[in-house]
Amino acid sequence: MTSFKHLALFLLPALLASGCTHASPADNAMACFENSGQDFSKVLSCYKQAAATQPLDYTPTGSTAFPGVEKRSFQLKSQTWTGHGYASPAEWEHTVDIYIPEAALHGKALLIANNGTNVPIADRPISAPTDFTQAMALAVAEQTKTIVISVSNIPNQYLTYSDDGVPRREDDSVAHSWALFVQHPENRPFVSLHVPMMLSLVKAMDLAQAELKPWQIESFIAAGASKRGWAVWLAALADTRVSAIAPFVIDILNTHAALEHTYNAYGKSWPLAFKAYHHEGITRQLGTAEFAQLMQIEDPMLYAKTEAGERLSIPKYIVNASSDDFFLPDNARFYFDELPGEKMLRVAPNASHYGISAFVEHSLVAFTNRLQQQRPLPSLKSVVQPEAGGARLAMNFSEPPTKLVQWRAHNLTDRDFRQPCGIHYEATDISQPEGQDLNVALKTPEQGWSATYVEATMADGLVISTPVQVLPDTYPTWTPKQIEPACKNLLDGA
């Protein structure tokens, strides 16, 4: 009888000639993209579809008992991603911690995109996540009776890029991946770091469903901050298991308009927080076809007229910082009203980009409880009506708030409300309206600019806000003054 080995040797040339070989996920993703007619809005779905052919790869690493909560830990290998051959290590790994409270609710879990460093370099060791701590996870699980899944190392970092041999993390890594994309978009559709970040969440959902069968988890509330909040948006667009989202401090939807607004509000300059994107030349790419192609992948608002557009209708709790280092306080003007479906906005007062962590636990508890109890999200509709000396903010509430506060900041010289620039929002209590409608007068300052919004607290502690209004709605012709090293702006070409 002919041995299997000899038979394989005999058949191999014929199999190769016929094309019957197993293509890699990267090859399959690229073939999908080419078959779509190089439709960049299909990049996420092509990458996810190609990765689905690979077996789920994870290992249990132990469990820990806390009062009222059990933590089960796993090591997940989510994918092999090289950024079209530019980034290493290629194997992405994550610590996945699943917090199961006593009497945990069935059907729906909370999925957290977390940070962390898992690839050390000479002077930077491995570090645990800080966006969403174990204490936060335990508190949210206990207070909501919801299983909480924390996925660390999104993105994996440090990643070393072969074009220059530099190890990068966080925005340095994202910005460099974008720079590689805009050089050759058609050849590198999957090189943006947000693409594998999205898939990390997809694979974590696969793991959770495999390990949590007694709780019959079918859907996930996904949350994350900053670039991880961006990954949450993309995961929601790509995977129907994401049934609701809570993105924190990623106030950049309708990205091109928001970036133009930023550039003009800072007197044709960029905030210091954009340093990585400025250094990589991304800020000089806004008007190019290549940047527009990148945004077809990145900007959730551009999916509205695509097959994934209906995903924008899932419940959304968008939590922004009033004093963000990256984003202007009134960026929501470019997207919030246009978003379909149930939606809420919260503006965290006197919070910087990194200070949002103080608001994460409370926000997630209130949002998750609403969803688990299948209660409608409160609606706060607001309209700004110009009038002499300022404007009138007209509001309508779907349910009566228990507390109303007007927050206002004033900058005498610049349209700049970043925390490092010495700006502080002052609170003024507002009397409860007799009905569902409320009107608040907004005064245009005689000098400089003001930023104002109204915050409403509901009976269950859920906090929502109107979008921030900046008056006058004009742009300065000068760059903001530098008060301290962190209050600085960058000029293109400098």
Residue ranges, per PLM feature:
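Serine-hydrolase catalytic core
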Residues: 289-349, 397-404, 413
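Catalytic-loop region of hydrolases
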Residues: 25-106
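Hydrolase active-site cap/lid region
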Residues: 234-284, 346-349, 355-358
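Gly/Ser-rich "nucleophile elbow"/oxyanion-hole loop immediately N-terminal to the catalytic nucleophile
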Residues: 183-226, 242
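Cap/lid segment of the alpha/beta-hydrolase catalytic domain
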Residues: 119-129, 141, 145-199, 254, ...
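Glycine-rich nucleophile elbow surrounding the catalytic serine of serine-hydrolase chemistry
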Residues: 224-234
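Short beta-strand element of the alpha/beta-hydrolase
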Residues: 95, 106-117
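Surface beta-strand/loop "capping" patches
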Residues: 367-408, 427-441
